[in-house]
Amino acid sequence: MPLTTTETRSRTEDATDVPWNVVVHNDPVNLMSYVTRVFQKVFGYSQERAETHMREVHELGRSIVWTGLRERAEAYVQQLHGYLLLATVEKS
């Protein structure tokens, strides 16, 4: 049985409303102090929180630095790319 317009719209809205993660990946180029400053500037994180995420990136190879709506996550990734950080968006 085909989906009604309401059912289709509801499924589409559900798909975009799922939380999305902004993931920063380790790279061999950027200094740890630089990555910390970028997290503070882009996300408004405290020194301590920014350093925690930076350490995750450095030690684990990645860190989920933000979770929320997809559109905002994609905007954050673009900002991070502007600072030459490796960042991606993934479903939470």
Segments (PLM) and residue ranges:
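Terminal domain-initiation and capping elements
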Residues: M1-S92
